[in-house]
Structure formats: C-alpha cells, structure tokens
C-alpha cells in the first residue's frame, strides 16, 4: 500500500470519453488498489451517477462535485471543493492509494492545479477531427499523458490517425500519448501501466 494517495487528474472536452475511461480504470484497478473518484459537473452529479450505475466502485467511494459556473475554476484557481471531497474520501477510506479526479467538460486551455493532481491525463477524441492535436493548448502539450480516444470513429468522420500521431509527436516532444477505444479496451492496459509506473503505485 502506498504511504501517500496518488491524485490523477483526468481532463478533456465534453464527450471525449473521460467518464468511460474512469469507469474502465476503476473496474481494472479496484481489486489491486484502494481507490476513489471525484467527478466535476457544472450543475448535476451526472458523471458520478454514471459510475455508480455502471458499478465502477461502491457509492461511498465516489463524490460528485457540482462546480456551478465555470468548471475550470474548480480544478485550477480554486480547487477547494475538490480538495474537500478528497479529504472526505480519505477519511472514509484510510490508506487510499489512488484518487481519480475527473474534470468537468473543458476546453484545450484547462489545466489542473498542482495541489490537486500529481499526474494529469488529457482525453481528446477522434470524432472532433484530426486537427485537434495541432491546435495545442496545455491539455495537449503539457499533460503527463495524452489519450486520443474513440479510434473506431476515424473512418466514420474521415480523420487520419496517422496525422494525429504525427501532430501529437510534434506538439508533445518526448511526452507520451496513447490511442484508445474504451469499447474494445484498446490502449487501456497501456494507460494503466503509465499510471502505476509514473505514480509509483504498489499493490497491497
């Protein structure tokens, strides 16, 4: 068991597949690690309810934060609601190894406060077009791991994975990125390996 709780921030635009990724990560990791989730929604707890319905974790391990107004503020300038939620989860479940913090749907300029996130994953999806990686922004260029999700939609929307691969390399330099598809599980084990290795997680 880790001595300190690893906080992983998961950001990305609305509809990119953040909640589906969180659900899959929980299902894969819950037997090996003591984990919990904080979700951010503007006016509802819809993402938290999705995770509960899909039995990602037990309900007492999931807290939905209603950010109101601008969701970026809750993960950056004023992370107090999220930090309070993490404190609540830590009190409920002593010895937490991992907390996944899912941001509300954001734009390419949103970033996590360093006090809220030790590792940041940024999720974009192929259906938004193959130009997204080269648009840049902190999510694309500075996140610890960029996840290019919904690869199965590439032929439908006419997006080139080769172009996205090239542009992601150009924009990110040496920083890693992974192509994924949560329906088939493509890329999931690579994402898990990244979290465990970079977060130095040790199974109990």
UniProtKB/Swiss-Prot annotation:
GO terms for cellular component: cytoplasm. Keywords: Chaperone, Cytoplasm, GTP-binding, Nickel insertion, Nucleotide-binding. One of its GO terms (molecular function) is GTP binding. Its main location: cytoplasm. It comes from the Bacteria. GTP binds at residues 12-19. It is found in: Cytoplasm. InterPro entries: CobW/HypB/UreG_nucleotide-bd, P-loop_NTPase, UreG. Gene3D superfamilies: P-loop containing nucleotide triphosphate hydrolases. The keyword Ribonucleoprotein does not apply. Pfam families: cobW. GO terms for biological process: urea catabolic process. Belongs to the SIMIBI class G3E GTPase family. UreG subfamily. Homodimer. UreD, UreF and UreG form a complex that acts as a GTP-hydrolysis-dependent molecular chaperone, activating the urease apoprotein by helping to assemble the nickel containing metallocenter of UreC. The UreE protein probably delivers the nickel. Facilitates the functional incorporation of the urease nickel metallocenter. This process requires GTP hydrolysis, probably effectuated by UreG. This is Urease accessory protein UreG. It comes from Hahella chejuensis (strain KCTC 2396). The gene is ureG.
């Amino acid at each position: 068991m880790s001595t300190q709780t690893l906080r992983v921030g998961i950001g990305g635009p609305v509809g990119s597949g953040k909640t589906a990724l969180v659900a899959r990560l929980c299902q894969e990791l819950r037997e090996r690690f003591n984990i919990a989730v904080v979700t951010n929604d503007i006016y509802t707890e819809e993402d938290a309810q999705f995770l509960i319905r899909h039995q990602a974790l037990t309900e007492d391990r999931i807290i939905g934060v209603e950010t109101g107004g601008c969701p970026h503020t809750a993960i950056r300038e004023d992370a107090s609601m999220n930090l309070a939620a993490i404190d609540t989860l830590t009190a409920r479940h002593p010895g937490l190894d991992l907390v996944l913090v899912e941001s509300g749907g954001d734009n390419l300029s949103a970033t996590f406060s360093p006090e809220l996130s030790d590792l940041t994953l940024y999720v974009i999806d192929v259906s938004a077009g193959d130009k997204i990686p080269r648009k840049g922004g902190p999510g694309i260029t500075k996140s610890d791991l960029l996840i290019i999700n919904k690869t199965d939609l590439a032929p439908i929307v006419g997006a080139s994975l080769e172009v996205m691969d090239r542009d992601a390399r150009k924009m990110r330099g040496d920083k890693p990125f992974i192509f994924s598809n949560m329906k088939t599980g493509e890329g999931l084990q690579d994402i898990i390996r990244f979290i465990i290795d970079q977060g130095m997680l040790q199974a109990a």
